[in-house]
């Protein structure tokens, strides 16, 4: 499995903003992340976290924390058998001898991805102006693109995005992943596919409306840059 993260600071979220963020999280989980099979998302109040953070696998009977929407500490195995969210998504990890775990430098459990966050360390509120956002998953590209969507959304909400370095056994990476994606669009192919005639001028206008940066055109070919939040 993979992990990536970023920090957003100087953000002022209302209760409605948080509701929108959670709605987006669940919509991404259900659709793009394929019901958490490819990736999952977590939000954490930065003020409660001590760096560095660690993502690893642990014996489910040694995992114990109070999950979201619960009042009592539960082991990893109990979460899958008793907690509603654990029952719903437990099939993603219940065949493993060890479960994924995300902890801070003090040993505080932040979450058990892709199942559920800790109630104490993994629940944000309107009083939080600094938030850690992470994605974990088995499909790295989906995980990276999901993180980019969230970074763009939180930036649009007024937050300042800070990168987080991830240390893998094979090397280091910084997230989010905002590299430009250049693409070439051949209008002959567009016309053949859509069955309509379209001029370069009209095509550039429509692409701009869709959020693409049109860099130029050479005859019947248009050059665009794809924003990192466009995964289609």
Regions found by a protein language model. Give the residues of each.
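RNA/tRNA-interacting regions in translation and RNA-turnover enzymes
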Residues: 1-232
């Amino acid at each position: 499995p993979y992990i990536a993260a970023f920090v957003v600071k100087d953000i002022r979220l209302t209760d409605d903003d948080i509701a929108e963020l959670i709605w987006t999280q669940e919509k991404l989980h259900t659709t793009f992340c394929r019901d958490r099979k490819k990736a999952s998302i977590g939000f954490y109040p930065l003020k409660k976290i001590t760096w560095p953070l660690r993502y690893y696998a642990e014996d489910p009977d040694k995992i114990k924390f109070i999950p979201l929407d619960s009042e009592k500490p539960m082991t990893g195995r109990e979460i899958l058998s008793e907690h509603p969210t654990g029952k719903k998504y437990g099939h993603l990890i219940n065949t493993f001898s060890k479960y994924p775990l995300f902890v801070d430098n003090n040993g505080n459990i932040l979450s058990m991805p892709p199942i559920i966050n800790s109630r104490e360390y993994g629940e944000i509120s309107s009083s939080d102006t600094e938030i850690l956002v992470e994605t974990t998953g088995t499909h790295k590209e989906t995980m990276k693109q999901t993180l980019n969507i969230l970074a763009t959304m939180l930036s649009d909400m007024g937050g300042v995005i800070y990168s987080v370095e991830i240390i893998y056994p094979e090397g280091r990476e910084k997230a989010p992943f905002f590299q430009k994606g250049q693409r070439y669009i051949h209008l002959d192919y567009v016309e053949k596919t859509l069955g309509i005639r379209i001029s370069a001028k009209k095509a550039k206008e429509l692409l701009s409306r869709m959020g693409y940066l049109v860099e130029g055109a050479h005859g019947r070919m248009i050059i665009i840059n794809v924003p990192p939040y466009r995964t289609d």
